[in-house]
Amino acid sequence: MSFGSCSRHALFTPGALPGSFRTMTTSCVKRVYTAQIRGGDALGKRLPSVSSFPGQLPRHGSHFQSLAFFSTSRRRQTPPPPSPPTTSQSPTVPSKASTTPPTSLNTSKPVATESQDKTDWSIIAKLAGNIWPKNNPNVKFRVIGALTLLVAGKVLNVQVPFFFKTIVDSLNVPITESTTVWVLAGASIAGYGAARVLTTLFGELRNAVFASVAQNAIRKVARETFEHLLNMDMKFHLERQTGGLTRAIDRGTKGISFILSSIVFHVIPTALEISMVCGILSWKFGWDFAAVTAITMLLYTWFTIKTTAWRTTFRKQANAADNKGATVAVDSLINYEAVKSFNNEKYEVAQYDTTLKAYEKASVKIATSLAALNSGQNFIFSSALTMMMLLGAQGIVKGTMTVGDLVLVNQLVFQLSLPLNFLGTVYRELRQSLIDMDVMFNLQSLDSATKDSPTAKPLHLKGGEIEFRNVAFAYHPERPIFRDLSFKIPAGQKVAIVGPSGCGKSTVFRLLFRFYDSSSGQILIDGQDIKTVTLDSLRRSIGVVPQDTPLFHADILHNIRYGNLEATDEQVYEAARKAHVEGTIQRLPEKYATKVGERGLMISGGEKQRLAVARVLLKDPPVLFFDEATSALDVYTETELMRNINSILTGQGKTSVFIAHRLRTISDADLIIVLQDGYVAEQGTHEQLLAMPGGVYHGLWQAQLTESTQPTEEEIERQREELEVVDEKKKQQT
């Protein structure tokens, strides 16, 4: 319940009570809360204090300045539409089929109460370790200091009604000409002001002290989650849509902020304040006042929890629609060129609108159920307040209570209204935060299919010999890629892997790099099974230029330096020269400071590939893997780049593997391995394979040779332009 408006009815009038009492006209206390507090639980929103920094929740101390009857009202606010998608996400990749279903980020399914309670407590226990770490006395000191300030603030807050009571009783006497306010109630007024100021001061100090504790916990959990995701295998990332994944992580980290602040600064202090008020009412005015208060608190809390549990289903549905909307929007924006190329803007908008409709439907349910919750809370508290005023009025009539006592009762009850109102909001947000964090912690609990074995040792390279021994692998059980693949790549030699599309050429690298693990067989490097060595040492020993070049939304200098973050600028420049991309970079307006755009969309495919080559040359690993590294280059640039690469490899003893469709680029390889239907169909040098009429390699070579004799569209266009230039010169001469 929030109090946003009040009626200006005076509680007392002259002559209505014994003695001479001046008319007290109450001033409306305007409390402006944000839409999150008024609306209760707008989707995706948090209490305003939490968004500023954890540990700061709306103040309890600044309550009502004068006695008044308040008509309570709460503004309804429909949940906001889904947050705009962040277009800087990594592109989603069509998932490979998997026998193990991925952990869903959809939180719309109801969870059994007992199971959910266990999950909630396990989440809280994990967070407790972050706010009370074993080997960090500084954090413990801050937590103790924050709790001390909290208790001190609550004790002072309860004193405010007592000062108010004393002021009213002091003024309820005959007024003479010599009487002044300071004579009658000066000390009480000063105490009233001091108590309110100190309550606010202690609250702000508490927030400042606890802020670093909460932020440190958030940073630690967020870092652990991000690190865990980076350590997951490729199958995990291919099966998940980036938009929904990042949205779930974002909500989970925000949930940490709310839970830490709400438990420490709302749940505990609210219970403390209710206990203190019930004790004071019982001690000062009897059990009936305390009984009404206790019953009201229990009924209010029970109603809020039950109603919120019913409304949680709608929140889950809205979250599921929000995740889906983010995924659809990110996919569409990332694939902007495809959308425009096929004129499918209306289709993409319709897809996004479908998710918005689902979100809208769930949001309407949230808003309408919120009205029922607000009405019930208002009725319960208003009924209790009426009963308390009735008991107080009877006490005044009987002479057992003074006017100040009535003021005291009224103020104590109203002081409970704020924590109770926030308790409802906190409970609603607490439940949602636990749901969001459950999804995030489930991500942390997933195991990677490819990870170091307990006995893994660093890879010791001797020459770089690679052997596939009876390897079987399939992305999907019904479509095996390799059945019994065996071949050996000699150390220090240039080896090419060729074959028809879909024969598994790129899969060789994915298995070697342990993006995936083979289902059977062994992959050896210098006689060491790659499953028995550490992933870090394995991947540091291999450099790759992938078929689809991944670039960051940063400048060219950073994208090349990513191969070796410790490299100097001069080393980066040298790698660019070796990759035959230095001239292109120098022609750009900002040269190495030029931004390449998201996924490198602001530069050509050939430039992206040359940057990737420069990056791997900067890494300078003993084993190099080129997966269609020159497919986007013109013949001249390709020839120059391959000449540079060959010169780098010459005499350095590096093992290099080239996957290529253009067979002329690998005709000088020491060994060519031809794959077909999951097996090694042929292997040998270029000359040996051509000497095998009817062979796979011979057929591929003849097909490309025939194709190369036909003029390309670019060559036809160039010839046409040359003819036009000749014709123009003839016209000028005539």
Swiss-Prot record:
Residues 56-142, 211-259, 306-371, 428-734 are mitochondrial matrix. ATP binds at residues 475, 499-510. GO terms for cellular component: mitochondrial inner membrane. This is Iron-sulfur clusters transporter ATM1, mitochondrial. GO terms for molecular function: ABC-type transporter activity; ATP binding; ATP hydrolysis activity; ATPase-coupled transmembrane transporter activity. The gene is ATM1. Performs an essential function in the generation of cytoplasmic iron-sulfur proteins by mediating the ATP-dependent export of Fe/S cluster precursors synthesized by NFS1 and other mitochondrial proteins. Hydrolyzes ATP. Binds glutathione and may function by transporting a glutathione-conjugated iron-sulfur compound. It is found in: Mitochondrion inner membrane.
